[in-house]
Amino acid sequence: HVILRGGRGGPNYETSHVAKALDLITGAGLPRRLMVDASHGNSGKDHRRQPVVTASLAEQVATGEQGLTGVMLESFLHEGRQEPGPPATLTYGQSVTDACMDITTTAAVLTALTAAVRTRRNFLLSERTVVPAAPPRLRSPTAVNPGVHLPSAD
């Protein structure tokens, strides 16, 4: 599996990074698919930026990218993290490892990703397009489905 998680050079989830990685994967004779880690280096190690990362991924999916096959998220019931300690001192539902999005934010992110996949599927079905191995970029998701509202990058 190939997982883009960002690194010393910064994030690698944007369209140009995904396209380059997919070209390298295809050039190596491997199936054209990868996952993106919305946390770690791609969020600048700030769990609150995961929705920004996933909004970019949703836009890529909604406009036709079929090589994105998965997204990794840091999620728990409550936002943030806490230091490990005696059970009586811990907040139930909050991470003791990496900082996480809360469940409400996670639900919104997953809803946006679901809408992006539906937009892509609806467009492909409406055009009766045979899905090629490396599809051309499609129209804007809002042009295809005006009801789709992706989270803003702010």
Model-derived segments and spans:
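Expand to "…catalyze enediolate/carbanion chemistry for C-C bond making/breaking, isomerization
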Residues: 1-131
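Serine/threonine-rich low-complexity intrinsically disordered regions
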Residues: 42, 151-152
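Ala/Thr-enriched low-complexity intrinsically disordered regions
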Residues: 129, 133-134, 142-143, 153
